[in-house]
Amino acid sequence: MITYKTGNILHDQADAIINTVNTVGVMGKGLALQFKKAFPDNFKVYKKACDEKSVVTGQMLPVPLNSISAPFYIINFPTKAHWKGKSKLEYIEQGLESLKAEAKRLKLKSVAIPALGSGLGGLSWQAVEQLIQTSLAELPEVEWRIYPPQAAPSAAIMPNKTKKPAMTKGRAAVLGLI
């Protein structure tokens, strides 16, 4: 079943939340940056997989969160080959097939999905939405929660579980010299 949601996808209690990524290990802007801050352990797994060249377009990288409550997985969905490039509809189409297979394998009942490749990726939301509708309708036993394009939340309300680096007097002195 496909439903539409609004709000911050990072707060969704679906079994899995989709994170749109590239294949080179950079989460520097947009939704990926929000995921990097909210789920730092996911970033470590993703970065290591990219360094090993095992993240490729068309294939999902599910990362278990080892949580007792949903979400249980972050599923990294490569929508771009490189962070400097644009997304391609073929990456979305191939990725949706892989996502359906992962949903079956992981026995997911619900998945929260952002506007794949439609923000910084540059794809038309209408074209992406059509692919999502057509592909995911084939697996109606999963609740697919679609988050259409919307403005980014303010920095003050974004989840941030990253640790602040310790600023010692010595480090401050060195920075003061620069």
What are these regions (language model features)?
Residues M1-I178:
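Macrodomain-like recognition of ADP-ribose-binding/processing modules
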